[in-house]
UniProtKB/Swiss-Prot annotation:
Top-rank taxon, per record: Archaea
Principal EC category: transferase
Gene Ontology MF: a single term: DNA-directed DNA polymerase activity
Similarity field: Belongs to the DNA polymerase type-B family.
Protein name: DNA polymerase 1
Positions of disulphide bridges: none
Length: 771
């Protein structure tokens, strides 16, 4: 099983290294024969002798083309003859490529920006993570001492925790009497002990949570200050930091550094990404949070160190559990796109699609288009096109709602209509599909590059799902599930990739044709439904909600199922409408904002944001009760009464302060904030009192009654004293409770002023409801 690949230089020549796990043993394979190359398209082949003479300089050494070879390729499906230009060293490519491109005889150069080791994996058909080797995992986490204003890495590391299948341990340099704590003499010895642990346990995968931007950069900084090395790589090298967009990325040679943070950010949508919040979201278990100022206080006073050690140990344990949960999926994505987990776990879906396409292009002898230069990128960003069809929702409370949607609408359109850059407006074509409204023509004489790949992916996914149903082995079932989910992620990213401004196979005409066909098919479904007595309540891109006013639930379900069967007989190719589900009651506020309740009493919401972290508990609770009154009891007047009661209790200071706390996360160093919001103001006041405030910390505050801006009246929850302080009732009514429910109740004709507690009685609008 290939874990990773890179190259080293020996006597000026590159040597590919393949890091592998074979029969339980780690090994490195070397290849000294692979050479870097690029392709050049010439105006006239006779100019090749001139091109061969082009030289450049790198670190005082002359860079030259060592060999040339004329090759037959395809470019967007059309035959093309190009020259393959070999160079001595991968770093020669960036040194000489512009000189080659600028030569008068050169039309353009291609595939000059594919990293050497990745190029090797593609050309040799090697796939990381293929095989049944059992990898070993170790999670690592650090705790540091930090005071506001200090530069990164100034304060010592006070604890290092690690966890694997055998359990979790903590290394520290202050005396703590706990069975899982190992005490050493100094920070220096603690870091050296970590190195020893990693070398002894020799894990294939090191799991961290934000290790790219915190744990490893901090460890490297402290090791440097203490004059010690951090040889964590299997080749005894230190972790290597590199820039990746706005972030850092840390590589450990011979091991996979699996940082959960970018993976979880890409995979799940949460209001906050603290380790505690993620653990609760994934496993439904809570984990105690010990705040930075508490850690600092415990370390400096010696009181409460056991609690900090337990917290540190749990950090490593939780990171290990999360790592084991998320790693298999990333391993399957790595297998699918043919690049190492280290890269895949830090990639956007657009980049995953691109690596997959680069590999398949090589297999099919296709020359990959170039990435856009700055000017072309800016031009693409300015381009726009019409998206999916969204129908404004029908207002009111509705009963007996069916949900129908297309299965993989955009991938199905791409395959059915052969939507691809190489089939677009193709000359000498016998059969075309013409996109509605936009008029782009796609040749049907041959399968397009991307539609054929997408078709293979969807076919493979169906086979895997069939095997899952047949399999009785739970382990095999789980692995197959990871595989089919990885395919789904990739398949669903192709439409977005066509419109991704940095894409090699960018195709605005393809993207707008896909959405045009999407609008046509969903509108066809709408018209056919309405002709059969259904009322369509809401449409969004690939799905819709409908009912038959006055009909019984069973009749609506039966007619919907028959309709799905009928419409699928009319739809072309892979297009298929599915009966998604049935809801007893529901309402639609605006586009992408609705709430429904199924027949089991489960409430489903979209876009109503009852989990945002900067909403207080009272706002979330009120919204939940309002939804329950409307959906479970079908009573909007009851919902209005709930809101009035809450606003009355707030006005009379009858709501407990713990329900008023607003949480917001510090996302960067305090000195970098230009706009001072309430959470930043509170954080700055805490820092002035010696509390360690760092990016990622969540600040909880309550807004007090008084004059002046909110930022001056916000107080940390720890400092709130109900005997001394009064919360700002008007602020919580106007900025928390009413915004949480107003958009819901506006859909039933209520205005903001109708929802507040008033001494005079309001007339209800319940008669306005539709049943």
């Amino acid at each position: 099983m290939i874990i990773d690949a890179d190259y080293i230089t020996e006597d000026g020549k590159p040597i590919i290294r393949i890091f592998k796990k074979e029969k339980g043993e780690f090994k490195v394979e070397y290849d000294r024969t692979f050479r870097p190359y690029i392709y050049a398209l010439l105006k006239d082949d006779s100019a090749i002798d001139e091109v061969k003479k082009i030289t450049a300089e790198r670190h005082g050494k002359i860079v030259r083309i060592t060999e040339v070879e004329k090759v037959q390729k395809k470019f967007l499906g059309r035959p093309i003859e190009v020259w393959k230009l070999y160079l001595e060293h991968p770093q020669d490519v960036p040194a000489i490529r512009e000189k080659i491109r600028e030569h008068p005889a050169v039309v353009d150069i291609f595939e000059y920006d594919i990293p050497f080791a990745k190029r090797y994996l593609i050309d040799k058909g090697l796939t990381p993570m293929e095989g049944n080797e059992e990898l070993t995992f170790l999670a690592v986490d650090i705790e540091t001492l930090y005071h506001e204003g200090e530069e990164f890495g100034k304060g010592p590391i006070i604890m290092i925790s690690y966890a694997d299948e055998e359990g979790a341990k903590v290394i520290t340099w202050k005396s703590i009497d706990l069975p899982y704590v190992e005490v050493v003499s100094s920070e220096r010895e603690m870091i050296k002990r970590l190195v020893k642990v990693i070398r002894e346990k020799d894990p294939d995968v090191i799991i961290t949570y934000n290790g790219d931007n915190f744990d490893f950069p901090y460890l490297l900084k402290r090791a440097e200050k203490l004059g010690i090395k951090l040889p964590l790589g299997r080749d005894n090298s230190e972790p290597k930091m590199q820039r990746m967009g706005d972030s850092l990325a840390v590589e450990i040679k011979g091991r996979i550094h699996f940082d959960l943070f970018p993976v979880i950010r890409r995979t799940i949508n949460l209001p906050t990404y603290t380790l505690e919040a993620v653990y609760e979201a994934i496993f439904g278990k809570s984990k105690e949070k010990v705040y930075a100022h508490e850690i600092a206080e415990a370390w400096e006073t010696g009181k409460g160190l056991e609690r900090v050690a337990k917290y540190s140990m749990e950090d490593a344990k939780v990171t290990f559990e999360l790592g084991k949960e998320f790693f298999p999926m990333e391993a399957q994505l790595a297998r699918l796109v043919g690049q190492p987990v280290w890269d895949v776990s830090r990639s956007s879906t657009g980049n995953l699609v691109e690596w997959f396409l680069l590999r398949k292009a090589y297999e099919r002898n296709e020359l990959a288009p170039n990435k856009p230069d700055e000017r072309e990128y800016e031009r693409r960003l300015r381009e726009s096109y019409e998206g999916g069809y969204v129908k404004e929702p029908e207002k009111g409370l509705w009963e007996g709602i069916v949900s129908l949607d297309f299965r993989s609408l955009y991938p199905s359109i791409i395959i059915t209509h052969n939507v691809s850059p190489d089939t677009l407006n193709r000359e000498n074509c016998k059969e075309y599909d013409v996109a509605p409204q936009v008029g782009h023509r796609f040749c049907k004489d041959f399968p397009g590059f991307i539609p054929s790949l997408l078709g293979n992916l969807l076919e493979e996914r169906q086979k895997i799902k069939k095997r899952m149903k047949e399999s009785k082995d739970p382990v095999e079932k789980k692995l197959l599930d990871y595989r089919q989910r990885a395919i789904k992620i990739l398949a669903n990213s192709y439409y977005g990739y066509y419109g991704y401004a940095k894409a090699r196979w960018y195709c605005k005409e393809c993207a707008e044709s896909v959405t045009a066909w999407g609008r046509q098919y969903i509108d066809l479904v709408r018209r056919e439904l309405e002709s059969r007595g259904f009322k369509v309540l809401y449409i969004d891109t690939d799905g819709l909600y409908a009912t038959i006013p006055g009909a019984k639930h069973e009749e609506i379900k039966e007619k919907a199922l028959k309709f799905v069967e009928y419409i699928n007989s009319k739809l072309p190719g892979l297009l298929e409408l599915e009966y998604e589900g049935f809801y007893a009651r529901g309402f639609f506020v605006t586009k992408k904002k609705y709430a429904l309740i199924d027949e089991e009493g489960k409430i489903v919401t979209r876009g109503l944001e009852i989990v945002r972290r900067d909403w207080s508990e009272i706002a979330k609770e009120t919204q939940a009760k309002v939804l329950e009154a409307i959906l479970k009891h079908g009573n909007v007047d009851e919902a209005v009464k709930i809101v009035k009661e809450v606003t009355e209790k707030l006005s009379k200071y009858e709501i407990p302060p713990e329900k008023l706390v607003i949480y917001e996360q510090i996302t960067r160093p305090l000195s970098e904030y230009k706009a001072i919001g309430p959470h930043v103001a509170v954080a700055k006041r805490l820092a002035a009192k010696g509390v360690k405030v760092k990016p990622g910390m969540v600040i909880g505050y309550i807004v007090l009654r008084g004059d002046g801006p909110i930022s001056k009246r916000a107080i940390a929850i720890e400092e709130f004293d109900p005997k001394k302080h009064k919360y700002d009732a008007e602020y919580y009514i106007e900025n928390q409770v009413l915004p949480a429910v107003e958009r819901i109740l506006r859909a039933f004709g209520y205005r903001k002023e109708d929802l507040k507690y008033q001494k005079t009685k309001q007339v209800g609008l319940g008669a306005w409801l539709k049943f």
